[in-house]
Design a protein with these regions (language model features):
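AAA+ ATPase active-site-proximal loops
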Residues: 20-170
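N-terminal accessory segments that target, anchor, or regulate ATP-driven/P-loop NTPase machines
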Residues: 1-21, 61
Length: 170
């Protein structure tokens, strides 16, 4: 009985090492994503596929389902991973400040704008910009967002100078 227990223990140790190695291989590619179901493997395959393109990506899901983790995995597997991914929660920002935060502003563009400020699109140049809760963005900002997506250019608040940007929007 003792030999059988010892043999089973050794088998469990070997199996544990193999599974740990398998998890580490997945973790190195996908960071903090821990789901191991068939559905999750399907999602991760899609992440690998879309990461190699520069396409804009829309991630849908309920609060707490890991949209930011998927966005980070897409960024980390992309050619843009040498630069930090910029994040912004559109629902947490008051509507009046959202435009300034996204596109930046010039000194004097509005009361309290005492200096020039770079927006998230400039900060994310040659990288990825993750807009969490993008559906909460005010309708009046959507044409400006569309211009960035289509033309890769925008203007800071208080300026008419076009700024070129190379951003992948997630």
């Amino acid at each position: 009985a003792y030999q059988e227990i010892h043999r089973l223990k050794e088998r469990l140790v070997d199996e544990n090492l193999a599974l740990t190695e398998q998890l580490n291989n997945v973790d190195s590619e996908f960071g903090e994503i821990i789901g191991r179901s068939d559905a999750m493997y399907s999602v991760l395959k899609q992440v690998e596929m879309v990461a190699q393109s520069d396409s804009t990506v829309l991630i849908l899901g309920e609060t707490g389902t890991g949209k930011e983790l998927i966005a980070r995995a897409i960024h980390n597997l992309s050619n843009r991973n040498s630069r930090r991914m910029v994040k912004m929660n559109c629902a947490a920002m008051p509507a009046g400040l959202l435009e300034s935060d996204l596109f930046g502003h010039e000194r004097g563009a509005f009361t309290g704008a005492s200096s020039q400020r770079l927006g998230r699109f400039e900060l994310a140049d040659k990288s990825s910009l993750f807009l969490d809760e993008v559906g909460d963005m005010p309708l009046e900002l959507q044409p400006k967002l569309l211009r960035v997506l289509q033309e890769q250019e925008f203007e800071r608040l208080g300026s008419n100078k076009l700024i070129q940007t190379d951003v992948r929007l997630i």
